[in-house]
A protein has these predicted regions:
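Mid-to-C-terminal Rossmann-like scaffold of FAD/NAD(P)H-dependent oxidoreductases
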Residues: 134-203
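Glycine-rich Rossmann-fold phosphate-binding loop(s) that bind the pyrophosphate
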Residues: 6-11
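FAD-site-proximal beta/loop scaffold in flavoenzymes
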Residues: 1, 72-77, 84-164
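Short, conserved glycine- and acidic-residue-centered signature motifs
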Residues: 12, 41, 150-154
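Aromatic pocket-lining residues of Rossmann-like dinucleotide-binding sites
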Residues: 19
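A structural signal for isolated positions on well-ordered beta-strands in alpha/beta enzyme cores
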Residues: 4, 27-28, 129
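A Rossmann-like FAD-binding core segment of flavoenzymes
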Residues: 22-117, 169
Length: 203
């Protein structure tokens, strides 16, 4: 009856909507002050937040989860640094991390474990290619390597591995981090940096 979704990125937001449409009482918690703060500017997250509020979804923003409480192996409450919220189901949507332990010490990676590749999808080891959410991507707006796990990136990279594995000729052009989401009747898309990030980057 009471569902708590922790993490208000794309997946958390989509799950919150899905549970609400199924008639559940939904609480959406995030440490950021806005939902989807890493992807969208405030003028757009305000629209999305108002949609949720109009549907009765409780938004708990700017709070960090401290612990879960319950009895007999069943969760009953989520406790944050500022309050507590009832929930008989808790879903964690707190981001991705590359599952690359198998290549630790064998391939060059970022600190988070994302495999570093060149423009042909080649790793630091000869004849070893990599693609998808385990890898870094060239982020064109900042002209740097970043970890951006998106299905669109993964599909392109997989195609490039297939094309280049015998004879590397087709270069990866990089990504703008383009993504989109539909929240109830609102369709929102973004590409490149948010205004906030762009200002911080140029300063």
């Amino acid at each position: 009856k009471n569902v708590v979704v922790i993490g208000a990125g794309y997946i958390g937001v989509e799950l919150a909507e899905a549970f609400e449409l199924k008639g559940k009482k939904v609480t959406l918690i995030d440490a950021e002050e806005r939902i989807m703060a890493k992807y969208l500017d405030k003028e757009f997250t305000d629209i999305a937040e108002n949609e949720f509020k109009s549907k009765g979804v409780k938004l708990v923003l700017g709070e960090k989860v401290a612990r879960f409480e319950g009895e007999n192996g069943k969760v009953q409450k989520v406790v944050t640094d500022k309050g507590s919220y009832e929930g008989d189901l808790v879903v964690l949507c707190i981001g991705f991390a590359p599952a690359t332990k198998i290549v630790q010490g064998k391939l060059d990676t970022l600190k988070n474990g994302a495999i570093i590749i060149d423009e042909y999808m080649r790793t630091s080891r000869e004849d070893v290619f990599a693609a998808g959410d385990c890898c870094v991507v060239k982020y064109n707006p900042a002209n740097e390597e970043r970890y951006i796990p998106l299905a669109t990136n993964a599909v392109r990279m997989g195609t490039l591995v297939a094309r280049n594995i015998e004879n590397p000729t087709l270069k990866y052009m990089g990504t703008q981090g383009t993504s989109g989401i539909k929240i109830y009747d609102q369709c929102i898309a973004s590409t490149g940096m948010t205004e906030e990030v762009a200002k911080a980057t140029t300063n």
